Amino acid sequence: MQTLKIAVIGGGSSYTPELIEGIILRHQQIPVTELALVDVEAGREKVAIIAALTQRMLKRHGLEQVKVSVHFGLDEAIRGAQFVLTQLRVGQLAARAADERLGLKYHLLGQETTGVGGFAKALRTIPVILQVARKVEALAPDAFILNFTNPAGIVTEAVSRYSSAKIIGLCNVPINMQHMIAGMLDAKEEEVRLSFAGLNHMVWVHKVMQGREEVTSKVIDMLCNGQSLSMNNIQSLPWPAEFLRALKAIPCPYHRYFWLTPAMLAEEIEAAKTKGTRAEQVMKVEQELFDIYARPELDEKPEQLSFRGGAYYSEVAVELINAIYNNLGKEMVVNTRNNGAIHGFDDDAVVEINSIIDAQGARPLAFGALPPIMNGLTQQVKAFDRLTIEAAVHGCRDSALLALVSNPLVGNVTDARALLDEVLTINRPWLTQFN
């Protein structure tokens, strides 16, 4: 009997039931025989709850034959896997909350994928993700790592540069934008094609096609007239119409952190005072979710998961697995090596771009050069990415300092030096490479 094993690193995540739902709905195309859920000892209770819920969900759909295994080490989970999904959080949500509070202490944004928050999370995550990659090299060399771990672009590039494991990075921002823009146009999803190019959480829609008609300017006009592209976890501040028309492209929700910085910072400061930082809010949501997940009568993904902020996560993951496993040659937006697709970026730079997905992995579609306003910002952030990776891999304080200085949301030496000292102190248990 042919086997199809999927290992989920961070299997105790609150997002996992959405992934399980996606696998169940696509079981005809993706005949999974084993789901190996991996977590750390601190997540033992959560992963046990997730495993039990997974078994109930499978039983509801007549898939009791799918084996669900739980692991607190990597070897047995990865051995024999065709796909290794990474959705881990080193330091758990408490570390994210500390990152956010640290940023606000310096009157800076500390969001978990941008600024000092993204920096600290990358330092904690890269050594661990490289351990996973080395296990994949040794125990499942033909497997694909599908990475959801934030900051997804940096983490994916670290694995791509420092291991031989096959990796593709994923994010739910492009698919959310696809759904929202199709909705704005009152069109079916399959009728609308978006051309993306940029970096993870710094990607633009450069062209919108509805059938054979280009409707980019129409969508921009709709955004200028009150429509909005927003996500649960990002304040939906409106873009000035003059700016959008000058840009001639559609920014992703995360661009607000870079181009509407004062307003976004003010909102986060106020939120931290009243309802808590985003991580502190998520902790409350997660506690409620796991209370629901633990109910023995629950055998489907609960509606409350939509409040967590990971909408369409499973859709992206399952579509990617399907495209690789069945050699579909399907176009998707992923994080992969540039290989000349975006001019001016190194071939080994990981970019977020439309790609053809088949059994060989991801092949980015040629794009060309980004317009100057986008290229300048993106090159600066890519420099930050590279320096952060070097700092995380080698425990290099010099690279870490330069990374923070190069980040547009820090951008000055005085704050960077002070922030670095605090990041290294607060995160000492996870940053042994700097000791």
Segments (PLM) and residue ranges:
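Short acidic low-complexity segments
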Residues: 67-80
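Long, compositionally biased stretches enriched for glycine and/or charged residues
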Residues: 189-435
